Regions:
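A short helix-loop-beta-strand connector motif used in the catalytic cores of GNAT acetyltransferases and
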Residues: 45-56
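Conserved GNAT-fold acetyl-CoA-binding loop/helix
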Residues: 25-43
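A generic secondary-structure signal
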Residues: 43-46, 107
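Juxtamembrane/interface motifs at transmembrane-helix termini
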Residues: 34-38, 47-48, 86-87
C-alpha cells in the first residue's frame, strides 16, 4: 500500500465534496467537514495561515482516502498542534489513514520541528482511538463537554505524542 500526502487545492474541490457527501453517515456526530463549495474555500483559506496545515491522504491512483489536518499550530516554546482527521467511504478501516498519519507525524516532527501533537477523541470512537494508539499516541486524560460537534457539546479523551516518544518507537 503506497499512500501519499497532497496539499488540499481548489482543483480537488468537487472530488472532495463528493467524498464528503458519500461519507455523511460515517462522519455523523464525529466530525463536520466542509460540505459546500463556500465551506471548502474557507477551509483552503484557513490552510493558508501559518497556524494550519492540511493533508489529503491519497491512494496510489490519487483517489482521496481521507484528510489529516494540523490545527492551531503554536511555535516558539510550545511547538504543538492539534490533529483533526477523517476517512472517506469506502476507504475507511483499511489502514490508509494510519499510513497517512504516520507520514503526517514524521513531517510534523522532522520538517515543521513540532514537539507535541494532540488528538481529542470522543470515547465511543473506537476506530479513532485504535488509529492513534497504533501510531504511538498515549491517553492523557478526559475532557467533558470539550468540543461542539453537530450542535452538541461532546466529551473527549485527550491523546498525545511527543517527538521523544516518537523517536523512542522508531
Amino acid at each position: 500500500m503506497s499512500i501519499h500526502l497532497e496539499t488540499p487545492t481548489r482543483s480537488r474541490e468537487l472530488e472532495f465534496l463528493e467524498a464528503v457527501r458519500r461519507s455523511r453517515s460515517l462522519h455523523r456526530g464525529l466530525v463536520s467537514p466542509p460540505r459546500t463549495r463556500e465551506q471548502y474555500r474557507g477551509y483552503l483559506k484557513r490552510l493558508s495561515q501559518r497556524s494550519h496545515l492540511g493533508h489529503f491522504v491519497c491512494l496510489p491512483d490519487d483517489t482521496l482516502a481521507g484528510v489529516i489536518n494540523l490545527n492551531e499550530i503554536v511555535r516558539g516554546g510550545f511547538r504543538s498542534a492539534y490533529l483533526g482527521y477523517y476517512a472517506f467511504t469506502p476507504h475507511n478501516g483499511q489502514g490508509h489513514l494510519a499510513a497517512g498519519l504516520r507520514l503526517v507525524v514524521r513531517r510534523a516532527f522532522r520538517t515543521h520541528r513540532l514537539h507535541r501533537l494532540e488528538a481529542n477523541i470522543q470515547p465511543a470512537n473506537l476506530a479513532s482511538i485504535a488509529l492513534v494508539n497504533a501510531v504511538g499516541f498515549r491517553r492523557e486524560g478526559f475532557s467533558p463537554r470539550y468540543l461542539k460537534i453537530s450542535g452538541r457539546w461532546r466529551d473527549h479523551e485527550r491523546w498525545a505524542l511527543t517527538v521523544e516518544d516518537w523517536v523512542a518507537r522508531k
